[in-house]
Regions:
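Short, charged, surface-exposed hinge/linker loops at domain edges
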Residues: 1-2, 44-108, 115-124
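A short, exposed loop/beta-hairpin motif centered on an aromatic-Gly-Thr core
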Residues: 23-33
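Structural detector for hydrophobic anchor residues on beta-strands
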Residues: 3, 15, 25-27
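Short aromatic-glycine-(Arg/Gly/Cys) micro-motifs in beta-strand/loop hairpins
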Residues: 7-22
Length: 127
């Protein structure tokens, strides 16, 4: 869903990003190109651990009238809510046997199952 992000920039600082549809949810970005990814991450952290239903996006005019929008730039960010589906599903993958063994050893050393280890690795690489 597309939401409004209010972006502010002061000289010598990162871009400040406020997401008014998510009260108290904010982020920062070094470049305007980073706003989308950082807004996504902020919403995921905002929703973590709670029963969360994505809000309906406020109209552009309503966001533009907010006090926090003054002297800011309004941008549309596309927030993906697939992270809310935490069902565990079986997956069949192919890899060299030695890599399966290395992953198994590393997972055991970390106190994880192979599946949990691979999920953590995927998250660490930005999935």
């Amino acid at each position: 869903m597309k939401y409004i992000a209010i972006v502010h920039k002061n000289e010598g600082t990162a871009y400040g990003v406020t997401l008014p549809d998510f009260p108290g949810c904010f982020s920062a970005a070094d470049t305007l190109d980073d706003v989308q990814a950082n807004a996504q991450e902020a919403v995921e952290l905002y929703a973590h651990g709670e029963a969360f239903t994505p809000p309906e996006p406020m109209p552009f005019e309503q966001a533009a009238a907010l006090e926090e929008a003054q002297d800011g730039v309004l941008m549309l960010v596309d927030i993906c809510f697939d992270f809310l589906d935490e069902r565990v599903v079986p997956v069949n993958i192919s890899m060299p046997a030695y890599m399966r063994d290395r992953i198994g050893k590393a997972a055991k050393a970390a106190g994880l199952t192979r599946s949990a280890y691979l999920v953590q690795a995927a998250r660490a690489y930005g999935a």
